């Protein structure tokens, strides 16, 4: 019984620190220093939330840039089901899945001449990736130009405008946020 009191008081102390003080402190500091990020990096148009800059969306029409495939297949880009497909490189199911994605991309992009960028046929680890490389976006230009009656030059400039360089030049690669790019594409039609 002598050891019960210190154990109980340590438990209560740690419960208050880890369950109360720490979450409250991180929430307050996050709201103070990074309010946009702490609230989900929501992209708004007026009072309407159009998406998040952190989570991809399922753009399926020919007039939109398509992102990486979502690993949450039943409900694409569902953050509650986030996670990879867990298929090993040696798994024949992964080969079938990639072959089906390649066939679908070839059918939707018959005018694209180069080989399909790998990120358009492989899901990210989270299954919610919102970024692709500018090269993967450029690969889709012929389909979008045809569907929206836009010039290749207009779409190339749009990709360049929304491309983000890595923080450190030699670590990482440039990326394009698909949600922001497609919202900008919609604004061209207005």
Swiss-Prot record:
Lineage top rank: taxon: Bacteria
Q: What InterPro entries does this protein map onto?
A: KdpC (IPR003820)
What keyword terms does UniProt attach to this protein?
A: ATP-binding, Cell inner membrane, Cell membrane, Ion transport, Membrane, Nucleotide-binding, Potassium, Potassium transport, Transmembrane, Transmembrane helix, Transport
Q: Where in the cell is it found?
A: Cell inner membrane
Residue spans crossing the bilayer: 10-30
Q: Name one GO cellular component term.
A: plasma membrane
Q: Does the keyword Cell membrane apply?
A: yes
Q: How does it sit in the membrane?
A: Single-pass membrane protein
Query: Which HAMAP family is this protein grouped with?
Result: KdpC (MF_00276)
Cited function: Part of the high-affinity ATP-driven potassium transport (or Kdp) system, which catalyzes the hydrolysis of ATP coupled with the electrogenic transport of potassium into the cytoplasm. This subunit acts as a catalytic chaperone that increases the ATP-binding affinity of the ATP-hydrolyzing subunit KdpB by the formation of a transient KdpB/KdpC/ATP ternary complex.
State how it assembles.
The system is composed of three essential subunits: KdpA, KdpB and KdpC.
What name is this protein filed under? Potassium-transporting ATPase KdpC subunit
User: Native species of this protein?
Assistant: Escherichia coli (strain 55989 / EAEC)
Higher taxonomy: Bacteria, Pseudomonadati, Pseudomonadota, Gammaproteobacteria, Enterobacterales
